[in-house]
């Protein structure tokens, strides 16, 4: 669960992770349900869901567990909170369960996920993508360097370091 003002309307919205959500015969694909806030609290109007291939980059694949972890904060500095979604089972460069974190940018004029950034160890995060690293098993947002922008913090509990398997890693972007 994560709550913040994703559409900059002055009311907190609620993101609910459903990493076990299935699509057809594919199990544990994952999805995030977004409930929009209003002056009267959470409403049924304007609610929607985001999944890989449906509002977020990527494609539906079993076992990826999209939305296993969630965090919010204004990463872009535009006044709308952004939603960070952990996908610890994501395939990255043919590496099963290497994992990723996706920043779904909040906006007053469009749905979360219209613009997105995917963070993996084959790009924005330190290290190289390896099978079973589980990048995105935990995510957080905080302004660690006090520059006014939220920094994305991504955990990978099964990252190996040298000959130490499962040593873990925290990446900050």
Model features per residue range: what roles?
Residues 11, 26-28, 68, 88, ...:
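Generic detector of contiguous secondary-structure segments
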Residues 14-18, 83-87, 152-156:
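Hydrophobic beta-strand segments that make up the repeating blades of beta-propeller
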Residues 1-11, 67-80, 136-149:
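Beta-propeller blade termini
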Residues 20-25, 89-94, 158-163:
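Short glycine/acidic-enriched loop and turn motifs that connect beta-strands
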Residues 31-65, 100-134, 167-173:
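Blade-edge motifs of beta-propeller repeat domains
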């Amino acid at each position: 669960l994560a709550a913040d003002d994703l559409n900059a309307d002055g009311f907190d919205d609620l993101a609910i992770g459903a990493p076990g959500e299935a699509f057809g015969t594919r199990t544990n694909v994952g999805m995030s349900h977004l409930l929009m806030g209003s002056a009267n609290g959470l409403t049924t109007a304007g609610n929607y869901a985001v999944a890989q291939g449906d509002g977020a980059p990527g494609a539906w694949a079993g076992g990826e567990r999209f939305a296993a972890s969630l965090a919010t904060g204004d990463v872009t500095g535009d006044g709308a909170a952004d939603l960070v979604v952990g996908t610890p089972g994501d395939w990255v460069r043919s590496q099963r369960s290497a994992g990723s974190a996706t920043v779904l940018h909040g906006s007053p004029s469009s749905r979360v996920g219209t613009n997105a950034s995917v963070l993996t160890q084959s790009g924005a995060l330190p290290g190289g993508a390896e099978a079973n690293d589980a990048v995105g098993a935990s995510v957080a947002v905080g302004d660690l360097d006090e520059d006014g922008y939220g920094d994305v913090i991504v955990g990978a509990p099964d990252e190996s370091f040298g000959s130490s398997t499962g040593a873990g890693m925290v990446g900050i972007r």
